[in-house]
A protein has these predicted regions:
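Short linear regulatory motifs enriched in tryptophan with gly/pro/ser
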Residues: 1-239
Length: 239
């Protein structure tokens, strides 16, 4: 049931200079004095009932690392392009090629979370897969003082429901799938179930497994390799 989709380009925006993270791709992020802790609510827009997560992350994380956290926490496969949008800014992975057609696209590894959305109630959008166009609304719920003893750099605090499967046709396609698997007599029930896999349950939310996988994202020099490892081992993640 996979769909053929053409990746679209982001809308051109004005570019302004944002602070560069002095430790990007050099040292792991650790909670320490002076580094605020963000509580973010992430809502997958258009899903009914809502698919959402509540995350705790350090405010000095860059958006490239946040992308890795979102992929693991939501349940995506990191097999499509993505971008962050806030204000009039667009940020993405420079290896995606988006900057080739739009030089105003910022390098996500040089944009810091606390600079992009510095205040409580600030919002940004994380779009994954420009064909299916999965838009995640990210809302700053709380900004807390850092706990010097904190050891986890990313934590899922709460959430609900499983992530839709990649390549299912976006919100409309996923809604159709949910209707089909409710009725074993539906003519597409067997093929849809086979494509989804027997273990897929749209109501499943495994907080323990998500956090076990998030602990693999320690962000030393290569976020991408650690994300790849976390996704490959996701089914086997244990406490």
């Amino acid at each position: 049931m996979k769909t053929n989709k053409k990746q679209s380009s982001p809308t051109p925006v004005s570019k302004k200079q944002l602070p560069v993270d002095p430790i990007v791709n050099s040292e792991p992020i650790t909670a320490k004095a002076g580094v605020s802790i963000y509580h973010l609510k992430v809502v997958l827009e258009g899903t009914k009932p809502l698919v959402w997560r509540r995350l705790q992350v350090p405010g000095n994380a860059n958006l490239g690392w946040l992308h890795a956290v979102l992929q693991v926490a939501m349940g995506w496969s990191n097999s499509h392009l993505h971008q962050f949008l806030f204000g009039d800014q667009v940020c993405s992975d420079p290896s995606s090629g988006l900057e080739d057609n739009n030089p105003s696209v910022l390098n996500e590894s040089k944009v810091i979370l606390s600079d992009a959305i510095p205040n409580q109630k600030d919002k940004m959008t994380y779009e994954y897969d420009f064909g299916d166009s999965w838009n995640h609304k990210i809302i700053v719920e709380k900004i807390l003082s850092a706990d010097p003893a904190a050891s986890k750099v990313a934590l899922c605090l709460d959430g609900a429901r499983a992530c839709p499967p990649d390549d299912c046709g976006g919100v409309p396609g996923y809604a159709d799938m949910l209707e089909i698997i409710k009725s074993p007599k539906h003519p597409e029930y067997e093929s849809t179930r086979e494509w989804l896999g027997d273990e897929f349950n749209p109501e499943t939310f495994d907080l323990e497994k998500i956090n076990a996988c998030l602990r693999k994202l320690k962000w030393p020099r290569s976020t991408e390799s650690l994300l790849r490892k976390a996704l490959m081992e996701r089914d086997d993640c244990q406490e």
